[in-house]
Amino acid sequence: MVKALLVGSKVLVPSIDESRYLYSNGFYGKPIGISKPKGPKDIVRPLELSLIESVYLTKKGLINVVDKNGDLLEYKKLYEYSAMKINKFEILYKVYEDLREKGFIVRSGVKYGADFAVYTLGPGLEHAPYVVIAVDIDEEITPHELLSFGRVSHSTKKRLVLALVDRKSEGIRYIMFKWVKM
């Protein structure tokens, strides 16, 4: 079991071997100080995991997260902690977990103005073909918001996907947009 340390809103994997293992088995995390690793051989520094990744990996039984006191954070406790730290965590986590379970590689999409950048092969092997924005299905989206979502995805040649999360049924509907010139 990989040992990880909770530090604020990040989780660190100090062991290089364990960092390499996580990265090579799903492209989890980012090595500290290495902006674009090409593969597991480039993982020569500790790995930094997001809270969303950490909750997922804890649920899958792949990592043990401990706090600054050395106390183990079980899945439920880490989930609750993350929900306090991250706005709309429940919705983001549902989408992250669903996409991972479907076999996609899911990374932060902040630099694209989205919640997630989604890969079929992985970072370093391809450019992310999709950007995903997670939305509560009951939340209204204005036409202006929709256009702003699409602006970045269009300029970076990525497909925009809205993930509509229904909290009642726990289902997720995905809508992909294709922008055309007229």
Swiss-Prot record:
It is an enzyme of class 4 (lyase). The keyword Cytoplasm does not apply. Pfam families: tRNA_int_endo, tRNA_int_endo_N. Keywords: Lyase, tRNA processing. Transmembrane segments: none annotated. It comes from the Archaea. Homotetramer; although the tetramer contains four active sites, only two participate in the cleavage. Therefore, it should be considered as a dimer of dimers. PANTHER family: TRNA-SPLICING ENDONUCLEASE SUBUNIT SEN2 (PTHR21227:SF0). This is tRNA-splicing endonuclease. It comes from Saccharolobus solfataricus (strain ATCC 35092 / DSM 1617 / JCM 11322 / P2) (Sulfolobus solfataricus).
